[in-house]
């Protein structure tokens, strides 16, 4: 106990002190890692199929105390695992104090962990991508690590961390494998929304709310979308292509829809990563990008720049126009997830997941949000998914498999949410029980709490991290009371 009081003191002083001056945005102080690979069954659930694939994982054991140090496990989500390593500084701020082993496994079908290389995304190969298979990968790898490092199952407890879909996975790991994971920090994990249990207008309404905090912004955004609609109605695709400096001019309604989606996505991303300092997570963005974008829009129009050009300037805060034009098809991919599938191969895998287990049926109506009407519903999702992946959507399955809103029999999970994050209303915002704790970060965007501490951090995220550390300590203390059990 005394050790832990000391630990808390140490931790808070180290968080408030020297480490605050780390410059996370340039990755200058991102700790080193070893890149390792492990063989995993392609299909954990069909015992007649013994094919395997190579899963990548990153490890740091420089602070690890094998006697009773915990294992900090990041539940890799939809992307290159190195990018999550670079953007999850909170774990590295606290790992040395906890003397933890840090492990980041990569999610199958993302980054380098492609079971069939570039043909992994063929209809007959993609079927091994699922939440269940991924969790089984993690459970198997964590068990192997416990054996390799000769750990006690109890005295070296495994704590799961994750942000966004990674947060969902962290929570699910605790539901499904409590024998392996002692507790989970699920940051910005919209578990209800992705189970299809939220209204379809929720997400973009909350994107709008973020921009509505900036004076004069939303009316200008509406005016700009109206100007786009007017041009499109008159068939003036030439004007739009010129004003938006498109590399490949649009010439029809389909092209125009893509332009709208690309534009809407700029708002989505800026709202999600509305961090208090410049960051390179889903793009290279300035501090408080929502405020920056709004001020620039207000400034531009005040200077007499026409509304469409001002709007294009706003988009260029997020999107590159290095070749002096925008390739909207390169920069935004339309898919089953209107909140964005990301880019490249990762977007293909996420598209498939959005068709199978993660329901992100969200749409805009121009009333509860500031965007043009872009409808999306279960029927459209079904048509798209059948056509693209040959899968029939099973809408109820996520709630059956992962409990829907009936989560109170789970224990030891922190659900943290930032109120600037457009996903926050999709997850638990109140305490469910003594050990299912909700942490609210008033000035936090998408999993700000998982990022490394920064001099510009608002007070609310410092308090949130403190509450999270308290819970983690509780889980570890609980574990240490129990005898050592080896595998
Ligand atoms: C992570 O950061 C390192 C620098 O520490 C950088 O070289 C690398 O490109 C980054 N990786 C990703 C995927 O962002
Ligand atoms: C912008 O373009 C540069 C140079 O082509 C590239 O290195 C960078 O990754 C691009 N950034 C984004 C956010 O696409
Ligand atoms: C907008 O104009 C204000 C007042 O001139 C200035 O302080 C601010 O930096 C400008 N912001 C942007 C993003 O252009
Ligand atoms: C949940 O309970 C913890 C104490 O266990 C408290 O600090 C926190 O504020 C509560 N969360 C909410 C959203 O009320």
Predicted regions and their residues:
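Conserved alpha/beta-hydrolase "acid-adjacent" motif
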Residues: 417-418, 422-427
């Amino acid at each position: 106990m005394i050790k832990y009081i000391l630990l808390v003191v140490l931790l808070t002083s180290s968080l408030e002190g020297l480490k605050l001056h780390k410059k996370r945005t340039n990755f200058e102080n991102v700790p080193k890692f070893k890149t390792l690979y492990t063989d995993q069954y392609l299909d954990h659930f069909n015992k007649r199929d013994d094919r395997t694939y190579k899963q990548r994982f990153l490890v740091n054991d420089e602070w690890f105390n094998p006697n009773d140090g915990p294992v900090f496990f990041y539940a890799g989500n939809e992307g290159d695992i190195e990018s999550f390593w670079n953007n999850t500084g909170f774990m590295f701020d606290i790992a040395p104090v906890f003397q933890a082993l840090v492990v980041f496994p990569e999610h199958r079908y993302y980054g380098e962990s492609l079971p069939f290389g570039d043909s992994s995304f063929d209809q007959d190969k993609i079927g091994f991508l699922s939440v269940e298979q991924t969790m089984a990968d993690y459970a198997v790898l964590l068990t192997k690590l416990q054996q390799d490092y000769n750990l006690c199952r109890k005295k070296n407890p495994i704590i799961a961390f994750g942000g966004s879909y990674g947060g969902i996975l962290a929570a699910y790991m605790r539901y499904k494998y409590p024998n392996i994971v002692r507790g989970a920090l699920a940051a910005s994990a919209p578990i209800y929304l992705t189970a299809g249990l939220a209204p379809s207008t929720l997400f973009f309404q909350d994107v709008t709310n973020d921009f509505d905090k900036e004076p004069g912004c939303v009316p200008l955004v509406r005016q700009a979308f109206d100007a786009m609609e007017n041009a499109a109605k008159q068939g003036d695709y030439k004007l739009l292509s010129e004003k938006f400096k498109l590399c490949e001019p649009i010439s029809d309604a389909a092209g125009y829809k893509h332009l709208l989606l690309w534009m809407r996505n700029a708002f989505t991303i800026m709202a999600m990563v509305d961090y208090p300092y410049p960051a390179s997570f889903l793009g290279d963005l300035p501090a408080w990008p929502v405020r920056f974008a709004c001020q620039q829009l207000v400034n531009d129009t005040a200077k007499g720049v026409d509304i469409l050009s001002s709007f294009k300037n706003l988009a260029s805060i997020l999107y590159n126009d290095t070749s002096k034009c925008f390739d909207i098809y390169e920069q935004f991919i339309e898919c089953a997830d209107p909140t964005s599938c990301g880019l490249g191969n990762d977007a293909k895998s996420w598209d498939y997941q959005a068709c199978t287990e993660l329901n992100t049926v969200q749409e805009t109506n121009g009333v509860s949000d500031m965007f043009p009407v872009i409808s999306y519903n279960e029927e459209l999702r079904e048509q798209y998914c059948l056509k693209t992946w040959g899968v029939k959507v099973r809408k109820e399955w996520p709630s059956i498999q992962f409990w829907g809103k009936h989560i109170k029999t789970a224990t030891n999970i922190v659900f943290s949410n930032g109120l600037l994050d457009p996903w926050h209303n999709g997850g638990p915002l109140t305490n469910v029980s003594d050990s299912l704790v909700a942490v609210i970060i008033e000035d936090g965007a998408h999993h700000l709490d998982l990022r490394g501490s920064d001099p510009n951090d608002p007070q609310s995220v410092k308090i949130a991290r403190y509450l999270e550390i308290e819970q983690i300590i509780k889980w570890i203390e609980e574990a240490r009371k129990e005898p050592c059990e080896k595998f």
